[in-house]
């Protein structure tokens, strides 16, 4: 098997973690006769430093042309990094949001596993943690607060902030379908968070 992998080492500890991950992939390739072709790309703060923007069209094109993307952390210390003095659309995380949209990466799957043996270390109530649990939390990544309009204005002499949470019917449908598909494969119950009214 031969695969092309776009590698975005990112910022902070990202380069160290991705470099070690590539070593693991190389061992897998060696053991099982695979070949991984890596294309090194920039995104986030390192791309701002090199290109003036957190995500370039070239990086998007290379990711789209690859079989997979291996990516490290994006961004840095918001209190000390000069990146966070930039407008929001030029900060490192704008690259992350841009690549998600460009590649259609809308579902973030976050497993949460607690073995019964570790229940005593869990901050949840004993009746919840005693038997352990295996949950998968799915989060939509390309709509809602990530891309909602924000504004600050004076209303009746008081400063007011608005941050909109908007989802299209298609965005809701695709995340619901993904959640049902994953739940069926896990042979578990599916819960959805209620919509605020």
Regions found by a protein language model. Give the residues of each.
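N-terminal phosphate-binding or glycine-rich loops at protein starts, especially the Walker A/P-loop
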Residues: 2-32, 36-37
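Conserved small/polar residues in nucleotide/adenosyl-binding loops
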Residues: 191-197
């Amino acid at each position: 098997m031969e695969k092309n992998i776009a590698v975005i080492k990112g910022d902070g500890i990202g380069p160290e973690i991705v470099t070690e991950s590539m070593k693991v992939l190389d061992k897998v390739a060696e053991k099982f006769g695979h070949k991984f072709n890596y294309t090194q790309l920039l995104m986030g703060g390192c791309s701002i430093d090199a290109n003036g923007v957190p995500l370039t069209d070239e990086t998007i094109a290379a990711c789209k042309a690859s079989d997979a993307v291996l990516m490290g952390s994006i961004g840095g210390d918001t209190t000390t990094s000069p990146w966070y003095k930039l407008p929001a659309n030029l900060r490192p995380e704008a690259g992350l949001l841009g690549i998600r949209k460009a590649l259609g990466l809308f579902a973030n799957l976050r497993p949460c596993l607690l073995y019964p043996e570790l229940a005593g270390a869990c901050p949840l109530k004993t009746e919840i943690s005693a038997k352990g649990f295996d949950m998968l939390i799915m989060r939509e990544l390309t709509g809602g607060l990530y891309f909602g309009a924000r504004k600050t204005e004076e209303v009746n002499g008081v400063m007011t902030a608005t941050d909109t949470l908007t989802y299209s019917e298609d965005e809701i449908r695709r995340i619901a379908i993904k959640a049902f598909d994953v739940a069926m494969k896990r042979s578990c119950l599916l819960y959805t968070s209620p919509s605020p009214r």
